[in-house]
Structures are given as C-alpha cells and as structure tokens.
Amino acid sequence: MSSDADMAIFGEAAPYLRKSEKERIEAQNKPFDAKSSVFVADPKESFVKATVQSREGGKVTAKTEAGATVTVKEDQVFPMNPPKYDKIEDMAMMTHLHEPAVLYNLKERYAAWMIYTYSGLFCVTVNPYKWLPVYNAEVVTAYRGKKRQEAPPHIFSISDNAYQFMLTDRENQSILITGESGAGKTVNTKRVIQYFATIAVTGDKKKEEATSGKMQGTLEDQIISANPLLEAFGNAKTVRNDNSSRFGKFIRIHFGTTGKLASADIETYLLEKSRVTFQLKAERSYHIFYQIMSNKKPDLIEMLLITTNPYDYAFVSQGEITVPSIDDQEELMATDSAIDILGFTSDERVSIYKLTGAVMHYGNMKFKQKQREEQAEPDGTEVADKAAYLQSLNSADLLKALCYPRVKVGNEYVTKGQTVQQVYNAVGALAKAVYEKMFLWMVTRINQQLDTKQPRQYFIGVLDIAGFEIFDFNSLEQLCINFTNEKLQQFFNHHMFVLEQEEYKKEGIEWEFIDFGMDLAACIELIEKPMGIFSILEEECMFPKATDTSFKNKLYEQHLGKSNNFQKPKPAKGKVEAHFSLVHYAGTVDYNITGWLDKNKDPLNETVVGLYQKSAMKTLAFLFTGTAAAEAEGGGKKGGKKKGSSFQTVSALFRENLNKLMTNLRSTHPHFVRCIIPNETKTPGAMEHELVLHQLRCNGVLEGIRICRKGFPSRILYADFKQRYKVLNASAIPEGQFIDSKKASEKLLGSIDVDHTQYKFGHTKVFFKAGLLGLLEEMRDDKLAQLITRTQAMCRGFLARVEYKKMVERRESIFCIQYNIRAFMNVKHWPWMKLYFKIKPLLKSAETEKEMANMKEEFEKTKESLAKAEAKRKELEEKMVALMQEKNDLQLQVQAEADSLADAEERCDQLIKTKIQLEAKIKEVTERAEDEEEINAELTAKKRKLEDECSELKKDIDDLELTLAKVEKEKHATENKVKNLTEEMAGLDETIAKLTKEKKALQEAHQQTLDDLQAEEDKVNTLTKAKTKLEQQVDDLEGSLEQEKKIRMDLERAKRKLEGDLKLAQESTMDIENDKQQLDEKLKKKEFEMSNLQSKIEDEQALAMQLQKKIKELQARIEELEEEIEAERASRAKAEKQRSDLSRELEEISERLEEAGGATSAQIEMNKKREAEFQKMRRDLEEATLQHEATAATLRKKHADSVAELGEQIDNLQRVKQKLEKEKSELKMEIDDLASNMETVSKAKGNLEKMCRTLEDQVSELKTKEEEHQRLINDLSAQRARLQTESGEFSRQLDEKDSLVSQLSRGKQAFTQQIEELKRQLEEEIKAKSALAHALQSARHDCDLLREQYEEEQEAKAELQRAMSKANSEVAQWRTKYETDAIQRTEELEEAKKKLAQRLQDAEEHVEAVNAKCASLEKTKQRLQNEVEDLMIDVERTNAACAALDKKQRNFDKILAEWKHKYEETHAELEASQKESRSLSTELFKVKNAYEESLDQLETLKRENKNLQQEISDLTEQIAEGGKRIHELEKVKKQVEQEKSELQAALEEAEASLEHEEGKILRIQLELNQVKSEIDRKIAEKDEEIDQLKRNHIRVVESMQSTLDAEIRSRNDAIRIKKKMEGDLNEMEIQLNHANRMAAEALRNYRNTQGILKDTQLHLDDALRGQEDLKEQLAMVERRANLLQAEIEELRATLEQTERSRKVAEQELLDASERVQLLHTQNTSLINTKKKLETDISQIQGEMEDIVQEARNAEEKAKKAITDAAMMAEELKKEQDTSAHLERMKKNMEQTVKDLQHRLDEAEQLALKGGKKQIQKLEARVRELEAEVESEQKRNVEAVKGLRKHERRVKELTYQTEEDRKNVLRLQDLVDKLQAKVKSYKRQAEEAEEQSNVNLSKFRKLQHELEEAEERADIAESQVNKLRVKSREVHTKVISEE
C-alpha cells in the first residue's frame, strides 16, 4: 500500500483509485470476530452479512444486519474476511475466497467509485453510469512505466503492462475485453487505444522534436474517424444499450522497433445480420437506416427513392424507430464525413447508400400465389423496379430469378418453381447477405486506410467481444457466442496454469500439475470434434430431406447418455421449448434448434447472385465475385485443398474465424479485462447482487477463483510470516542466536497443530491452500488474547507487590520513629543530657552571627532586585493590559467572522438544498415527459400498424374486385365455349374410353419411371457419398506427392465413369419426365374440358342467382345510405348549432376578459403613477437592502422561472396527452370500422370458399358419373339404336337449357348495368359524405382556433395577474405612510378578482343552460334539417377564412425560411473561411512533411546511386580485365612473329600454326565482342532498372502524397471532433466558472457581512436605531403576511368554486349518459321493428316446412335466439348465426338437388324401359324446388340487409356518444385551466410568504448578532474589571511588603 503522498501524482483521480491511509488504519483497528462474522445465503439479496448465534446438527442460526434471525444449512454459511481485506485491490489475496466475498468486495469498492479491481489475472471493471475523472492526461502519465503492484487497479495499468512486456520480452500482446451488452467494453477499448496513442507518440523524449510533426495521435484519430462508420452499420439499439455493438472486433495496434505506433487493422466477428430483417419490439435495426431517413440530406432520399417514414419499410419498423439519446441527423453527417475521411471514392459512397436503400426496398417486395397452383408470382413490380434500379439490375430478370430460379441438375440447369414463403425467405437471405458483405468490405477498406506502410515489428491486440449469454430462448447465435467464450475460458485456464507452473517451478514446489484448460475439453469436444454438434449440423445440411427433427434425433442418438455435458432439458411452464442442454463452465444452457439447418446453410438464390455478379454497379459485382470463384473452384477441381468450398456453412466459417482468432491469441501474451453491468436501470452506485453474480459466473471470474483454490492461492514471504506468526509458538524459534527466516518458518509451522499437507515451502515464500491462512489468523487472535490476558495478570501482580513493599517500608519507618521517641523520653532527665542541651547551642553562635551578616547582604541585594523586578512587572502589566485588549478585540473579530461564515454556510446549504430539489423536480418532469413520449411512440406505432392493416384490406378488396372482373370475363368466354363444347360432346364421348385406357397405361409407365428415378437417385446418393469419402482421403493424404498423384488419377477415372453413368441416367430420366409431363398435360386438358362441360351450366345458374342477390343487396345499401345521409344531416345541424352557441359563449367570455383586462390595465396605470411619486423613497430603501437582497432575489427569480417553465411544460404535456387521447379514440373508432369491414370481407371470403368447395364436390361427383356413364356405354353398346333416339330427346333438352342460359346471360347483363349505375350513385353519395366530413372537420378546426384564442386570453390574464402581484409586493415595501393606499388598491384588485370569478361562474352557468338547450334541441332535431344549407354556407365561409389564415402562415413560413437560408449562407461562409485557414495551416504542415520526406527520399536515391555506381565500376573493372587479356594476346602474337622470323626454315609448319593461332585470336575477339555486348546489355538493363526505380519512387511519392492528404483529412476531422469536445469542455468550464462565480459571490457577501459587522461593533448606537427600524419593518411584514393569508383564503374559495364547477360538469356528463340511454331506447324500438320483420320472415319460411324440415328447425332456433338476446352485440351474433343456418340450409337444398339429380339419372335408366312421363314429372318437381330455394335465398338476403342496417344505426349512436364524451372532455379542460390559475395564485402567495420569511430571518439574525455583541461587550468589561482588581491587589501587596 502506498501512502497518500505517493497517490498525489494521480491528482483528483486519487480517491477513485485507492483508499486513503486513514481508511486503511480504521479498517485494521475495526473490531472483528472471525468465528461469528459470516455471509449467509438469502433468497432476495443472494448473500447477506450476519453474525452466528448457534450451531446445531448441521444447521446454523445467525442474525442478519437487518435484524432478522435465519437458520440455514452449514454449506450456505461462508466465513467473512478480516477488516484489513475490505475493499482489497486484488481479490485473489483474500483469506477466504468465495462468491459472497468477491461480491461484497466489488460492491464496497463500487460504492466508493473504485470501479477497477483485480481478481488474479483478471481486471474486473464495473460500469459507473457516470463520468469519473480517472482518464485524464495526469492519470496517463502517473501509470506510465509502473508495475502492476505499484499502482492501483486501472485499465491504464493493464495497457501499460502489455506495452512494457512487448518492449522488454519482444513478444506480441493481447488484451481480452469481454462482458454483456452495455457493460462498457467499447469504452474501455477506446481508453486502451487512447493510452497507447498517448504513450507511444510521446514515449521517446530524445526524439520528440523529430517526431513532433509526424505521428501525433494519428492512429487514434484514424480509428475515431472509422468509429462513426462502423457504428452506423454495426451498432443498433437493444433493450439494455442504446448504442450496442452487434459484432465483435479484434483491433491490432502495430508498433515499430522503437515502440512507436506504426499502423493498425481491425478484424470483425459474428455480425448479427438477422437484425437486418427482424427486430424485437423494444429494439431497432442498424443506425444507418434511420440516419438516412432523418432527412438531413434530402438528396439521399431522392437518390434512394425512399420516404422519410420508417414505417413505410417492413425490415426497419418492427421495433422502435427513434432513440432519445441519439440524434440521427448529426450521426448521418458524422457517417458521411467518415466515408470521405477514410478515402472511399464518390462511386463507392453512392454504392454504399444505394445498397442500403435496396435492402430497405427488399422488405417491401410482395408476392402472391397463382390460382390453382402453389407457384409464387409478383404482386406488383413497383418496389422491385426501385430495388433493381438501385442495384443496376433488370427488374424483370430479378423477379424471374426470385420466382423461377435455375438449379443445376447434373450438367444442366433446370428452372424450379418457388412458393410464396420460399420467395420471401430468399429475399430476406439476399438482403442479409448484401448487408453483411458490404459491412465486411467496408472493414477491409478501413484496414487499407489504417495501414500506413511503416515498418512494424510487434503488435498489441484488443479483443472486444460479447460475453457468455444465457437467455430464455437460445438459438444457434448463442451457441456460437458461448462456444467462443468457452474457448477463451479454456485459453485463460491454460494460461493461468502455465503461470502457476512457472511460479511453483521457480519456488521449487512439489505439486501434481493439473492443466485446468482440460476441464472444459469435454464441452468443447462435444461441440467441435468429429460427430460433435457442429459436425452433425453440417452433415445434416448436406442432406436435402433433413429436418430439425432428424437433426435432433441424431444428436440424441450420438450424445444423449454418452456425454455428461449433453442433457435433455426438462419442460418448463411458461417458457419456450428447449431441445437439448449443454453444461458450460458458466452454467447449463437450454438450446432450441428450430431453423438451425436453414440458418447454417444460409442459402442464397444462385440465379440472383449471378445477376449481382453481372451488375453494372462495380461494388455489388465485387462483393459477390468470391461466390462465383468458390463455385468454380468447387465445380472444377473437385478435390482441392478446401473441401466443399462451394458449400461452406455458417458454422464452418465461424469455426475457421474462431481458430484464426485463437491462433492469434496463442501467439501473444494475454491480459484479461471483464466488464460488469451493476444494474438494469443504469442507476449510478446501485448494484443488483443476482445480476452481478450471474456475470461473474459467465465471464470466468469465479472459475479463476476455483482454479486458485485448487493450488496454493495464499503465499507470504518468510520474513513476514516469521514476524506475524512467531507469536503462535515462540519457543520453536531459539532466542539469542541467528536463524534463517525459512528455517524459522519451517520450525514454527512444524510445531503448530495444522494439516501439514495444506502448505508448501518455496525458496522465498511459504505457500498455503485456501482457508489455512484464515485458520492461522484465528489461532493468532486466540494466542494474542491469551498473551494479553497473561500480561494483564502479571502487571496487576507487579503493581500489588509494589504497593505491598511500600506498606512494609512505611511500617518499619514508623517502628523506628517510635523506638527513638521512647529512648529520648527515657534519657531527657539525665544531668549530663541537660548539660549537653545547654552547651550545644553555644557552640554554634559564632557560626550563626556569620550567617546573619551574610543574610543581611543577601537581603540588600534581593531588595534591589525586587525594586527592579517591580518596575519590570509594572511595565509588563501595562503591556499585558494592552495585549488583553487586543486579544479581546481579535476574539470579537474572530467570533464575528465565524458567525458570518456560519451564516454564509447556512445560506450555501440552503442553496444546495433548493438546487437538489429543483434538480429532482426537473428529473421528475423529464421522466414524465419520457413516459409521455413512450406512450406517444406506442400510439403512433399502433396507428401505423392499423394503417398498414387498412392498406392490406384495401388491397384485398381490390384483389377481390379484380377476381370478380376476371370471373365475369371468364363467364363470357365460357358462354361461347359451351356452344362449341356441346357440339364436341358426342365426339369426346367416344374418345374418353380410349383416353382412359391410355391414361392407365401412362400411369403404369409413369409409376415405372418414378421407380427407376428413385433407384437412380439412390445410386446418385451412394455415388455422392463415395465421392465425399474419396475427397476426404485426398485431403488427408497430402503428405506424399507421388501417392497423391496416383490416387488423384484413379479418382478422376472413377469420377469420369460415374459422371458418364450419371449423365446417361439423368438424360434418360429427363426424357421420361418430359414424356410424362406431355402426357399429363394432355390428360389434364381433356379432363379439364370434360369437367368444364359438366360444371359450367350449374356455375352459370349459381352466378345468375348471386347477381340477383347482389342487385338486391345494393338496392338495400342505397336505401341505407340515404337514411345515413339524412341522419348525418341531422347530426350536422345539431353540431353546427352547438358550435354557434359555443362561439357566442366564447365571444362573451372574451369580452368579459377584455373588460377585466381593461380594469387591470387601468389599475396598472395608477400604480405606475404612484411609482413615479414613490421613486425617491424606494431608492433609499433599495440602497439600504441591496446587498442583502441581491442573492435572494436572483435565486427567487431562478426558482420562479424554473417553476413557471416546468408548469408550462406540464401544461404542454397535458395538452399533448389530451390530443393523443382524442386521436386514440378516433383510432379506436377506425379500428371498429375496420374490424366490421374485416368481418364482412371474411364472411364474403368464406362464402366464396364454400362455393368453391361445393363446386369441387360437384366436379368430383361429375367425374364419378362420367366413369359410370363410361361403364354404361361399354355395357349397353348393343342398345345404341334406342339410345340414339333418346339422345335426340336429350339434345332437345340441351337446346332448352342453352336457351335458358342465354336468357340468364341477358338478365345478367342487365343486372351488371344496374350494378354499375348503383355503383356510380354510391360513389356520388360517398363524395357528398366526404365533403360533409371535410366541412365538419373544418368547423372543428375553427372551434379549436377559438379555444386556443381563449387559452391565450387566459394566459394574458394570468400574466396581468402576475404583474399585479409583483406591483403589490413592491408597494408593500414602501413606507407606512402609503400602506393604507396600497392595502386599498389590493382590496380593489381582490374585488376585481371576485368579480371575474363571478363572471366565470356566470359563464359556467350559461354553459349549463346551453347544454340544457342542447338537450331540448336533441328532441327537435327533425325541424333543424332545413338549416343544413345555411350551415354549409357558414362552413364554406369558415373554410375561406382558414385558407386566408393558412396563406398568411405560409407567407410567414416563407419569410422565416428566407431568413434561415441567409443565416445558413453566412454560417457556411464562416465555416468556409475557417476551413480555408485550417487548410492553409495544414498545407504548411504538409509542405514541411513533404520537404522532410523528399530529403529522406533524396538520401535513399543517393544511396541507390552509389550502389549503381559501384556496380558500374565493377563492370568497368571487368572490361579492363578483358583489355589486359587482349594485351596479353598481343604479346603472344609478337612472340609468334619472332618465332616466325627465327624459324623461316619451318615456314609451312609455322604458317599453319600461325593460321591456327589467328583462328584462336578471332575466336577470342569474338568472345571479347560477346563480353562487351553482354556488358553493354547489362548496363542498359541497369539503366532501365534505375529508370524503373525512379518511376517507382515517383509513384511511391504520389501514393504517400495521397495518404498524406488522407491523413490531413482525417486530422481535420479529428480537429473537428476535438473542437467539438473542446466545445463540450468549454461548456463544462462555463458551468464550473458559474459555480466559481457563485462561490466568489458568496465570498463577497461574506466579506460584506464582515464589514457590516465591524460597522455594527464600532457603532452600537446606530445598530440600536436600526433594530427599532427593523421592528417597525417586522410589524409591516406581519401586516402584509395577514393580507396574504386573506388572499390565500380567497384563493381557496375560488378553488371550491372550481370544484363546484367540476361537479356541474359531472352532472352534465350524467345528462349526456341519459341522452345515450334515450338513444338506447330508440335503438330498442328499432330492434322491435326488426323483430317484427323477422317474424314476417319466419312466417314465410313456415310455408316451406313440408318441403325442408331442417330449414324450419333452424328458423325456430333463430326465433329463440332473438327473443333470448338482451344486448345489441348478442343480437348481431345471433343474426350471424341465423345467416350461417340459412347457408347450411342452402347446402342442404343443394344436396337435395343433387339427390334429385341422382334420382333423375335413375329415372333416365328407367326411361330406357319406357318412363318418359316420370322424368318430366321429376324435372317439374326439381324446378319447383329450385324456385323455392331461390325465394328462400331472397328472404335470407333481406334478413342480412336488415341486420346491417341495425349495425349502422348502432355505429351512429356510438359516434354520437363519442361526441358527447368529447364535449365533457372540453369542459374538463376548462376545469383544469381554472385549477392551473388557482395553482398560480398559490405560487404567488408562497413567493410572498417566502419573502416575508426571508425578511423575518434577517431581522432575527441581526437581533441575534446584536445580543451577542452586547454579551461580548459585557464579558470584556467584566474581564477588564477583574484585571483592575487584580492589579490593585498586587499593588497593595507590594506596598505592604515594602
């Protein structure tokens, strides 16, 4: 522990990092009982502190801190650590290591704002949720170069250790930062980067000057500029965090050889791409979508073809769309500037935005199912056109690729049909893939920008990744995250084991090493090894027919019961189903495997991917080039190194990335940081125990403690152990001789009764198992208690012995004295003794005389010295009196200062309290505002959802209308076909038999081909399995090249053979399938034509019936609409009448208010005149009280302003709330209307579906009949002649039916014309209705405007009243001379207030009268229908007025926009000038850098030139050597010539040799020429290389120039961010200066009060006079207080009046409810009329009882249901039931018709035997039954029409009640405003009361100061008197002695 002086270097951060010395000493001296102080388990708090009271039978009874007594088991009790371990910095050093000790240590440190704590190798950080001063530059420099144990825990300490290890060990480092979302991972990552950037740039002070212009914060600035881009595309709002990173990242910061920053790069992991298409309710998608739609850049909206409403796009509007803490507009500008800074080109920027917009459009693409097919088709192409345009694709190709993708089968491509759901899944997968690939591409581009190309040697990696996740629903994403954390924990355990091993090895400890990294091996192998979860998942993904169930079954077969980590979860109520559980180190997690196969495959539509690759957008094509390459590689090589590269699953890719990460981490020295969320509510200082414990388990802190406990976690140096625990057995260590500390510790531990296996001796330390040190501490405490007791006993014995010894000595001395006295008494009468007594004094007389003389001399001397001393004493006394006087004066002054200081402190405390109260109020108001905003957001979301549903319903209605039109067209077509088909009927009868035979034969052949196809598929599957095995063998046998070649040749031969077989099989199957398809199509055509022939006639009859019904329904609808229009007109008249009455009332009230305002203004004028008269008197008073009132007045004003603002905010919020409630009610009405429309549509849909089903049944029956006819034709071929005659009869009947069909079609055409005419009339009525609704809306708007004017008048009145109260308060301070006048004026004002209140009450009574009139007008509403036209004219006038007002508003808006534009232009010019200045400064900096870099390049070029010159010199030397060789050859030539001259005799031989030598010379010359040419060529190449190098250097210079420009841009951006931060800092400094000014003002007040007190002490008489004046003022204030009290009572009276008005409003509400009741009675009368109509219907139905028994029963049930119904909703339901019964009756009738048809068929058979008459009778009976059915259906339609009419009546009544409720709400608003006035009056009274209290406190204070001054004067006077008395006494004593 360092001292407070050592901590001074941390500055203001010191108290947030380490305890002070005082706290440490207090903790060590705190009383503590190790046996009784424990933690016990608690169900609420997890663990609580307690004191053990008893232990019995394995149970412990303890008393908690809260006073509760609990009894728990022994294993739920945990011992507490001694107080010296409180707030310990490294939790691994605690005596007792367990969960509650860790929890409470973290909690106590967090309460003291020490957020960083070590736990062994971990650094645990708790999110403070507020700013702490622990990251400033002072702290950075303090941690620089410090070891871990030398400084308090901090993220800077971890960073500095990593940096120092990198420099000293020359090893890469890594910092692993994990934790849940919102725990502070990203913030700590930024702090790490900040630290490295600071120390690495300013690290080498010797070269500081040289590097000052190069890398000053460059890396940090670049990463900061990358952050907005990464956060925009990778961050989103979650439940816990508004800006949560939805991806992990590993940031590598590279350093050069000297430790300077070199470059950086980023790797990302596990981007949550599912968020692109799906979000939870409380979350939202990635920020970029909402930034674009914030409309900060309108050109983006136009470019992307989108709107600014997120609810228009399904992918981004499933959750919330706004975040209060994020400004999307500012974030968009930051993102846009980051794109520029990071060097993206303009095309790339546009591509990024376009791809983002395309993803949004993908979510709006609609598809529907084709009729009679499962094939999907586009439902509109508008959205697809936009998406394709943004991606530079062809819209038709895109839609075709989505609905009809091409699939490769063998070597051919086949078009495959897609269902609607499959298409939607494909669209979602494409959107996610585009977004993910774009994000990864942006990361790659950022890395290219961050790579500065500087030399780098080592790096420090910072891993920011999500922690362990255990949710209620855990899917594949959670398994990946948890598996990552499992691997990281294994890595930590192994690393910790290695460190422990090194420690034990260094200390020479014998220990059985356990690799704790293997503890997690079982779980990891279960997931990643062969036949593990991932392996099985990937295997299942390869099988086409695999499902989630088959995957689950395989998991169970493979692992259930075989692995302890794999379990089957127990079903829990209320939770999502779980399929299997895994036992992780952090707990057991239940996983749900739904959709894992699809997630893992993550299939993409390959056809669309092909379109992407061919896109004209380069970025999109580049993003998907890798996909094509992978396919080519997978398809072409078939046996490369990367197996299955064309089919890489998500899990395989994840494992590959994870393995790379683990490889990186294993190559580094790791440091671990764990981030903790203290609570879910983001409250600073609060900690939730269960939440923190869950995180400690999940992030491995408790796992690390477990590993510590397995070894020897506690370790102490021998010297420290000997010194502390020697007391346990001091005899074990011999005294008086030297002994080594290690031997002493061994002897000491050997002599103590402890388990000797629980400790080990190292070279320098003794190591203990967990808990043993605590046991030694307890033994030491017991031993110390014994020793202290023994010491106390010895001390008490020693003191008793000393006392006894004194008593014995006293007794002996007494005995001696008694003996001597007795002896003297015996000898005093002896004569010799008497002589001795007489002589003895005479012997000393001479000596006494001498002594007397000496004494006289001494007396004289002392007398002189006394006189001198007396003189000195007098002087000193005088000085003392003067000093005492000064002392008293100083004491009085100090006392006065202390009093004034106390007063100032009291005032300061009061100010702080008021500030806290105001802050609390502000917080409450902001919370309320946030709640209201949340409610508003929910309502708007609901509104959007309803609008979407409404639009969907409209689309459904449009679709139904389209289908109806299609059906009508088909009907016309089929009418033409019927004629043709009747002619072809005879021919088709003959061909049917042949076709059926052919069909059977084809079916058999089709079955045979299916069997063959299945066999071929089995073969293909076996072949694919064999192929995969062979590919595995190829991958495994890469070691030897020769074997691989042989195996590859064999495999290729087998593959070619198999492919040939496969092609043949596929070709044969394709041929068979084509034949089969052709035959099926022919067969379907024939069957379809046959079924059409039989069914079209019946369809046409049913259609004619339906059209007749529709005509009747539309006629009824027209009547109903006419009735509705009449009712609407009546309600309009009523509403207009009410509006005119209300407007008259508002005008009267406004006139009254103006009168009151005139009175108050006249009163104000009088007050101003009086003010002018009293100006002089008031100045004198203000000068006297200015200094005392200044601070109070400012505070009052601030308080009043803040209260007024809060009140206004509350009023605004209430108004917003009321508006929202109105909108809510209107939305509810719309919901009801939509629900009713939905019901009608669903009923119509159900009817259509029933009709379809019946038609299908009829078709099937006709098919069966067709087969029977076929058999009859085959059986009765002999009777063909007779049948021909019968066929003539049938043809006649067919002609009759044709004529009937033509008649029906003509009737249908007439009906369609009528329908169109009715539709046109209906549209006209709807238009008229909408015009009326618009008029009503405008009238409401006028009413709202009038209401707002009224509110403004009310506010003006309140302002006047506040001014009046201020004038009253000023008048009250005037002299008593004018008090009576002021009182009279206030009384007059009060009378005016009373009059105003009376007028308001009259107005309220008038409102009541108006409501009564409304009730009477309700009864006479029929008479007011004639006034509708006049009201419509008024409405038009009001509309014109509104239009004029709107025009004025638009003009004003235009002027405002122009001024805004001017402001923006001037602001832009200012920014441009600032930018210019910055660019000039940066250009200067750039030129300097360029100059330095050019100098460096010049030096490098010089060095390269030297090297080239050296090479040239070498070449010239070689040429010189060649010249020497030539010279030597010339010498040889000369010698040969000499020999020639000498040997002329042998001329021929010499000539031959000469020729030979010349040949040699020629060859040598040739060689020399070749050498020369080679040298020339090399020189030319070198010249070219030099030129190439020059060009390369020029390019490098250009690239460096571009990077320098990018750096300058990033630096400018950083400067901008820095300026922004400086602006924030300036604001904070302004706040600080404001606080300092407040303190300085308080100090000035204190000094002023000091001066005032000095004046009062100097002038007591003036103070007395001032006291009298203050008494007079007090009397005046009391009178004013009485007046205010009377005013408060009057305000209470007005409050009671408002209460009465509220009751009146409630009475009006009751009247409205009575009116509703009256309407209800009218409704019941209508119901009675409806019942009468229904009885008529039942009578008509009664006529059919003999024909249809079921219809009569249904009608009786309907009667019973109608009579039993009590409520309107039940009657509607019963009516629906009756309609359903009638529908069933219709079905029954249709069934009877079918039965009759069957009988008719039988009759036809009988007719063969001669029964034609019977057939005719049956046909007549059938026609009668059909007519009856038709009449019954008509009656049913009429009943439904009446039911709908009553439903509309109910809606009208509900609408009327809603209008009444709105009127009540308006009255309630009026009451609320009156209450607000009352509150303002109360507030004024409170302000006056506060002012009186302040004056009273000032008076009391001055009176108290006066009394104290009098007391001090009395005390001083008494002290002076005492001193005088004393001086007199001394003087008298001196005189008497003289």
Curated annotation (Swiss-Prot):
<feature type="modified residue" description="Phosphoserine">
    <location>
        <position position="392"/>
    </location>
</feature>
<feature type="modified residue" description="Phosphothreonine">
    <location>
        <position position="1264"/>
    </location>
</feature>
<feature type="modified residue" description="Phosphoserine">
    <location>
        <position position="1242"/>
    </location>
</feature>
<dbReference type="InterPro" id="IPR014751">
    <property type="entry name" value="XRCC4-like_C"/>
</dbReference>
<feature type="modified residue" description="Phosphoserine">
    <location>
        <position position="1494"/>
    </location>
</feature>
<feature type="modified residue" description="Phosphothreonine">
    <location>
        <position position="64"/>
    </location>
</feature>
<feature type="modified residue" description="Phosphothreonine">
    <location>
        <position position="1254"/>
    </location>
</feature>
<dbReference type="InterPro" id="IPR002928">
    <property type="entry name" value="Myosin_tail"/>
</dbReference>
<dbReference type="GO" id="GO:0005516">
    <property type="term" value="F:calmodulin binding"/>
</dbReference>
<feature type="modified residue" description="Phosphoserine">
    <location>
        <position position="1541"/>
    </location>
</feature>
<dbReference type="InterPro" id="IPR001609">
    <property type="entry name" value="Myosin_head_motor_dom-like"/>
</dbReference>
<dbReference type="InterPro" id="IPR027417">
    <property type="entry name" value="P-loop_NTPase"/>
</dbReference>
<feature type="modified residue" description="Phosphoserine">
    <location>
        <position position="1287"/>
    </location>
</feature>
<dbReference type="Pfam" id="PF02736">
    <property type="entry name" value="Myosin_N"/>
</dbReference>
<feature type="modified residue" description="Phosphoserine">
    <location>
        <position position="1291"/>
    </location>
</feature>
<dbReference type="InterPro" id="IPR004009">
    <property type="entry name" value="Myosin_N"/>
</dbReference>
<feature type="modified residue" description="Phosphoserine">
    <location>
        <position position="1305"/>
    </location>
</feature>
<keyword id="KW-0514">Muscle protein</keyword>
<dbReference type="InterPro" id="IPR008989">
    <property type="entry name" value="Myosin_S1_N"/>
</dbReference>
<keyword id="KW-0597">Phosphoprotein</keyword>
<feature type="modified residue" description="Phosphoserine">
    <location>
        <position position="1513"/>
    </location>
</feature>
<feature type="modified residue" description="Phosphoserine">
    <location>
        <position position="1599"/>
    </location>
</feature>
<feature type="modified residue" description="Phosphotyrosine">
    <location>
        <position position="424"/>
    </location>
</feature>
<feature type="modified residue" description="Phosphotyrosine">
    <location>
        <position position="1463"/>
    </location>
</feature>
<keyword id="KW-0067">ATP-binding</keyword>
<feature type="domain" description="Myosin N-terminal SH3-like">
    <location>
        <begin position="33"/>
        <end position="82"/>
    </location>
</feature>
<dbReference type="GO" id="GO:0005859">
    <property type="term" value="C:muscle myosin complex"/>
</dbReference>
<dbReference type="GO" id="GO:0000146">
    <property type="term" value="F:microfilament motor activity"/>
</dbReference>
<feature type="modified residue" description="Phosphoserine">
    <location>
        <position position="1602"/>
    </location>
</feature>
<feature type="modified residue" description="Phosphoserine">
    <location>
        <position position="1573"/>
    </location>
</feature>
<feature type="modified residue" description="Phosphothreonine">
    <location>
        <position position="1516"/>
    </location>
</feature>
<dbReference type="GO" id="GO:0006936">
    <property type="term" value="P:muscle contraction"/>
</dbReference>
<feature type="modified residue" description="Phosphoserine">
    <location>
        <position position="36"/>
    </location>
</feature>
<dbReference type="InterPro" id="IPR036961">
    <property type="entry name" value="Kinesin_motor_dom_sf"/>
</dbReference>
<feature type="modified residue" description="Phosphoserine">
    <location>
        <position position="1738"/>
    </location>
</feature>
<keyword id="KW-0787">Thick filament</keyword>
<keyword id="KW-0488">Methylation</keyword>
<feature type="modified residue" description="Phosphothreonine">
    <location>
        <position position="1466"/>
    </location>
</feature>
<feature type="region of interest" description="Actin-binding">
    <location>
        <begin position="760"/>
        <end position="774"/>
    </location>
</feature>
<feature type="domain" description="IQ">
    <location>
        <begin position="784"/>
        <end position="813"/>
    </location>
</feature>
<feature type="modified residue" description="Phosphoserine">
    <location>
        <position position="1725"/>
    </location>
</feature>
<feature type="modified residue" description="Phosphothreonine">
    <location>
        <position position="1500"/>
    </location>
</feature>
